[in-house]
Amino acid sequence: MDVGVGRIPCMVRKPGAERARAGNGLLLESRAPLCEPTMFGFRSKKTAPTPDAPATPEETPEQKEGWFKRLRAKLNQGDSWLTYDLANLVPGGRIDDAVLDELETRLIMADCGVETTDRILSSLRSKVQRKELDNLDALLKALRGALIDILRPSAKPLLIDESKRPFAILIVGVNGAGKTTTIGKLARLLKQAECKVMLAAGDTFRAAAVEQLQVWGQRNAVPVIAQGSGADPAAVIFDAMQAAQARDVDVLLADTAGRLHTQTNLMEELKKIKRVMSRQDPTAPHEVLLVLDASQGQNALQQAKLFHEALGVTGIVLTKLDGTAKGGIVLAIASEMRLPIRFIGIGESAEDFDEFDAESFVDALIKPTSEVG
């Protein structure tokens, strides 16, 4: 199933349209609708209210601007790493090899990788040869277009099939990537959208992992299915699948262990969990969401390749873009993996977690000409 971006939507329990867009991009599809989406109000059209379903307010311009400002500030930590000082490299407005070489260096240093950087630069060099880039404005416009062309195919909404009860999302990733925090933030968004949510504490190996997830469950008023430390993770998640079905849960978020991705036993364990989930529902898990620490750079790309090969990843969350990461790894993953990037995280607070939008991300990286110098 094709899945993508979204600040999740959800559901008021009543018959609804056969297909509706909810909130920041989460799409709900159902052959026999069980729920009608309630919108977060982030970058979405407002649906007309029915007598028993009040309209949900759209995201205000101030909210949109607030997220964009935080995104730009966190990605750049001051000056735009990609376009700062470019005006000084374009004497008389002439775009030459020196300017393109500088851009190439910046892209590689920002973890875009050689392959992705070559793809971007080849597009720009061909335009220079055709004399289409004769000033800084034209260069920035072409650069923006090249980056968006890479990212847009990965900016896909997350699809929740309402005929799947529960819609089971398996969260995977190495220790320290931010899986449990991501689960907590997703649970919060789902609750805001009136989804009935349950968490499964499948990381039974890491010290205090179960307790950490239970704290998120209490914070969001969401039930957590857990067993003791050292319990069989597959058994925990199987129990959670049964409980979610019995309690008519909309979405189940399953945490997993995250020991080093180079350990074969971890991948085998995750494969076992997938098999066990499919015994309860042959179509489960309905989403395999990989959480990556963006500050890991090219190592995050290697993690994505290994997890995808082993498990068939259907969506990615990139966390910690507020740290040392400059965002280039987002371009590398979109270019080389061509997997949907669901969400990005730029901080610890719930407001620092949002759906991935290609245009906003690129605009946060590239300052307008008036600010470049």
Would you name each region that the model predicts?
Residues 4-156, 163-170, 192, 219, ...:
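Non-catalytic terminal/linker segments enriched in charged/polar, low-complexity residues
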Residues 115, 148-373:
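P-loop/Walker A NTP-binding module and the surrounding RecA-like catalytic core of P-loop NTPases
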